[in-house]
């Protein structure tokens, strides 16, 4: 089964309308007001980690759910529920005390498209090591974060490199992670040109604050540094809105669109993401 390409070409759509900057900002702000509502959380995978009251559980559940956020919405919800059910009432406690020999079998029947229970168990083991070293995923991420950088691109590259360099010997006795290991799909990198949709989605959930949609529990990362979580569906929408002319849903497009959005809200450029996604998920017409 082929993997969904985060840098896949976008089919040409209806020609975009020519809008002034003021008109485009008004349109985006209207979409934000219309769709950024808590009663629409049920249409998002974010509704799953929202069930946990404790921030450490939201962090771990958020990473698991965001990692599985590819495929159709029902499938994502089903797989996320299955994964978290196997982890018990506290995902953070499960990961902190994770032992491969004891706990990997909990995921023996797990499948999400081409990712298997082994991939999910190894992901939990990598998260376990990150928490063991730094205490939280935020602290692990912050090792590579520089607030002076324009965006979180360099921090993501560092995060991915360090995560994939952790011990894998309980799953691969050679101690070397194979190039085609399924767990690598959970850790794409801007260095390879990937749009990193799911990692950027997780960061949006953790960092953004103020409207009750995202958690805002990573207070040491600025929302101004976030990059739009871009996949082919969002890419089609932003092209139709006139935010980019690029044809590939890759890191270049993600950063270009984010720069355009930053001109409308320098402090919170990805606040429009939830609304843009609702257009696709709810099959609403894209404004021309």
Outline where the language-model segments fall.
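HhH-family (HhH-GPD) DNA N-glycosylase catalytic core used in base-excision repair
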Residues: 2-288
């Amino acid at each position: 089964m082929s993997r969904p390409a985060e840098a896949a070409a976008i089919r040409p759509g209806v020609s975009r309308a020519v809008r002034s900057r003021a008109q485009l900002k008004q349109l985006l702000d209207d979409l934000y007001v219309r769709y950024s509502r808590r009663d629409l959380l049920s249409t998002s995978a974010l509704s799953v980690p929202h069930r946990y009251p404790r921030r450490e559980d939201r962090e771990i559940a958020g990473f698991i759910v965001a990692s599985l956020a590819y495929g159709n919405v029902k499938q994502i919800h089903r797989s996320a529920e299955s994964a978290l059910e196997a982890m018990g009432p506290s995902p953070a406690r499960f990961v902190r005390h994770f032992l491969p020999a004891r706990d990997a079998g909990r995921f023996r029947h797990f499948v999400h498209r081409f990712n298997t229970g082994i991939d999910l168990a190894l992901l939990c083991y990598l998260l376990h090591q990150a928490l063991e070293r730094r205490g939280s995923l935020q602290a692990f991420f912050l090792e590579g974060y520089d607030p002076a950088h324009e965006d979180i691109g360099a921090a993501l590259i560092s995060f991915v490199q360090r995560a994939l360099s952790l011990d894998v010997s309980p799953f691969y006795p050679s101690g070397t992670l194979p190039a085609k290991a399924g767990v690598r799909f959970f850790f794409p990198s801007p260095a390879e040109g990937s749009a990193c949709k799911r990692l950027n989605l997780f960061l949006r959930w953790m960092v953004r604050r103020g409207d009750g949609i995202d958690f805002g529990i990573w207070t040491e990362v600025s929302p101004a540094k976030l990059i739009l979580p871009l996949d082919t569906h969002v890419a089609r929408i932003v092209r139709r809105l006139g935010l980019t002319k690029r044809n590939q849903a890759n890191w270049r497009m993600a950063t270009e669109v984010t720069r355009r959005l930053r001109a409308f809200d320098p402090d919170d450029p990805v606040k429009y993401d939830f609304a843009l996604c609702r257009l696709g998920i709810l099959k609403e017409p894209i404004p021309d």
